Amino acid sequence: MPAYWLARSKVFDPAEYKKYADLVPPILAKFGGKPLARGGRFQIMEGPEDFQRFVVIEFPTFEQGVACFSSEQYQNAAKFRRNGGGVVEIVMLEGLGQ
């Protein structure tokens, strides 16, 4: 059953955040992750307007998405945004069965 990595970000240092963003695509692919939406046009319909970048990644399974996030490779890449590049909230959401 597919699962979705939903992320919302606020970027503080674009150069540091870009280092993170450049490293992530091959890591996601290694775990079967497929970007469905990333940094495009958005409109906040309800709630606080604290975030300015939104990402949706599809994984074949919930477990693969969690394994990707927990991987050493992803955690090393995430250091660039965690060290002042930005703040991110990430949620894994299991999809509906077919």
Please annotate each region the language model reported:
Residues 1-54, 59-70, 94-98:
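Short S/T/G/P-rich N-terminal loop/turn motif that feeds into the first structured element of a domain
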